[in-house]
Curated annotation (Swiss-Prot):
Keywords: Amino-acid biosynthesis, Isomerase, Methionine biosynthesis
Reactions mediated catalytically: 5-(methylsulfanyl)-alpha-D-ribose 1-phosphate = 5-(methylsulfanyl)-D-ribulose 1-phosphate
Protein name (Swiss-Prot/TrEMBL): Methylthioribose-1-phosphate isomerase
Pathway: Amino-acid biosynthesis; L-methionine biosynthesis via salvage pathway; L-methionine from S-methyl-5-thio-alpha-D-ribose 1-phosphate: step 1/6
UniProt keyword annotation of Amino-acid biosynthesis present: yes
Length: 330
């Protein structure tokens, strides 16, 4: 896959360069981040997004805090508050804590986290490719831009295409931030995978016409029973796929599983500014003063899942047993 990575670290400059994903696909612009404060703001503003990529960025945010002489407790707090739903953020910061005050150790651990993301996603792509075929539908963005590695759901799709199993991809535009239209379409085009963009509301009609053979999505946080949070709109896709008898898969690294949660009821759902719904790139698309509601994620019950694609293989029901075993909790 012709990867465009969401970041790079210039150690000699003490700068973490982020590809500003808000400006894609029209422009590929990298912005410099020099402090943990700036990193937290960049994560909040979605300069960088996607659960694994946020985790890697937060880890390097703590490296920047050392380099900039910031208060480490405050830096950690700011980064944790930047996006509440993606559990990878918290896992990465937990791993960085033992290295507070140790710049060299912090840098080694941040690089280790990034390397593990790449290794994990290569495995997810291999396993996921074995269960996808024909025409596949996906939602939001789960490629290298969202992860810093090879991608989760999109990595599996690209590998399945390479193996001759998948022939075409339906890409939900993913309102209101248009991650599908702006980012997934961009990555699939670079990878040379045949794909077609659709509005979110078209998915059910395509399923009814027999034009979808499987659905695969990413995960921002999964509970131990398999309930999971992903970009808002995922729940509707799961219900539609179930109604039409279409396999529905979630692809994720096991680091996206929150072992503290027995079910999806405890997953915090980020609510973003209504302005992101009523306006796009500064252009208002709704009447002035008209209210909007903007939960960034929804929770899909595990009963709608056919399988969970992880770096250790594809898990099938009962998911609680499989996840506990994969996490080494039994």
């Amino acid at each position: 896959m012709d990867r465009v990575l969401p970041f790079r670290f210039a150690e000699e400059e003490g700068v973490f360069w982020l590809l500003d994903q808000r400006r894609l696909p029209q422009e590929e612009v990298y912005v410099p981040v020099r402090t943990a404060r700036e990193m937290a703001q960049a994560i909040r503003d979605m300069v960088v997004r996607g659960a694994p990529a946020i985790g890697v960025s937060a880890a390097f945010g703590m490296v920047l805090a050392h380099l900039a002489g910031e208060d480490l407790e405050e830096a950690d707090r700011r980064l944790r508050a930047s996006r509440p739903t993606a559990v990878n953020l918290f896992h990465a910061l937990d791993r960085m804590r033992p290295f507070w005050g140790d710049l060299a150790g912090s840098l080694l651990e941040a690089r280790r986290i990034w390397r593990e993301v790449e290794e994990t996603e290569a495995a997810i792509s291999r396993h996921g490719a074995q269960v996808l075929w024909g025409q596949v539908l996906t939602h939001c963005n789960t490629g290298p831009l969202a992860t810093g590695g090879y991608g989760t759901a999109l990595g599996a799709i690209v590998e399945a295409y390479r193996l001759g199993r998948v022939r075409h991809v339906w890409v939900d535009e993913t309102r209101p931030y248009l991650q599908g239209a702006r980012l997934t379409a961009y990555e699939l085009q670079k990878a040379g995978v045949p794909a077609t963009l659709i509005t979110d509301g078209m998915a059910g009609w395509l399923m009814a016409r027999g034009a979808v053979d499987a659905v695969v999505v990413g995960v921002d946080r999964m509970a131990l029973n398999g309930d999971f949070a992903n970009k808002v709109g995922t729940y509707a896709l799961a219900v539609l796929a179930h109604h039409h008898g279409i396999p529905f898969y979630a692809a994720l690294p096991l680091s996206s599983v929150d072992p503290r949660l027995a079910s999806g009821e405890g997953i915090p759902i980020e609510e973003r500014s209504p302005e992101e719904v009523v306006a796009f790139r500064g252009v208002r698309i709704a009447p002035e003063g008209f209210p909007a509601y903007h939960p960034a994620f929804d929770v899909t019950p595990h009963r709608y899942l056919t399988g969970i694609i992880t770096e250790k293989g594809v898990l099938y029901p009962p998911f609680a047993e499989g996840l506990r075993r994969a996490l080494g909790l039994d």
